[in-house]
Amino acid sequence: MFGKGGIGNLMKQAQQMQEKMQQMQEEVAKLEVTGESGAGLVKVTINGAHNCRRVEIDPSLLVEEDKEMLEDLIAAAFNDAARRIDETQKEKMASVSSGMQLPPGFKMPF
C-alpha cells in the first residue's frame, strides 16, 4: 500500500510537518493585522491570538450623537481584523502540508 519504506517515509514527513506547524503557529502568534471600517475612520489591530492590541478612532467620530455608529464601526473593524488573521493562518497551514506526498483520501488532523 505504501511501497518500499512508505510507512517510515510517511512518519518522517508527518514529524517534519509537525515541526513546521509549530514554527508556523509561533509566527502567527507574533503577527499583527489591522482591520478597518468606515473607510478607515476606525482601525483595530489584533495579534495572531485575536487579542486586541490597538484601536484608532478618527476624531471626527467623537461626538455624542454618533456613539452607536462608532460602536458599530469598532465591532466591524475588529471583525475585519479577525477575518484577516484567519485567512493568514489558513494560508500558512496550507503551505505546511503542500510538500507532503500523502496517500489519496488521507485527511490531516487539523
From Swiss-Prot:
Keywords, sorted A to Z: Cytoplasm, DNA-binding
Keyword Cytoplasm: yes
Name of the protein: Nucleoid-associated protein YE3092
Keyword match Cytoplasm: yes
UniProt cross-references to PANTHER family, sorted A to Z: NUCLEOID-ASSOCIATED PROTEIN YBAB
A GO CC annotation given for this chain: bacterial nucleoid
Subunit structure and binding partners: Homodimer.
Record-linked InterPro entries: YbaB-like_sf (IPR036894), YbaB/EbfC (IPR004401)
Role of this protein: Binds to DNA and alters its conformation. May be involved in regulation of gene expression, nucleoid organization and DNA protection.
One Pfam match: YbaB_DNA_bd
Protein's cellular compartments: Cytoplasm, Nucleoid
Sequence similarity: Belongs to the YbaB/EbfC family.
Gene Ontology molecular function: any one: DNA binding
Signal peptide (from-to): none
Superkingdom of the source species: Bacteria
Major place of residence: cytoplasm
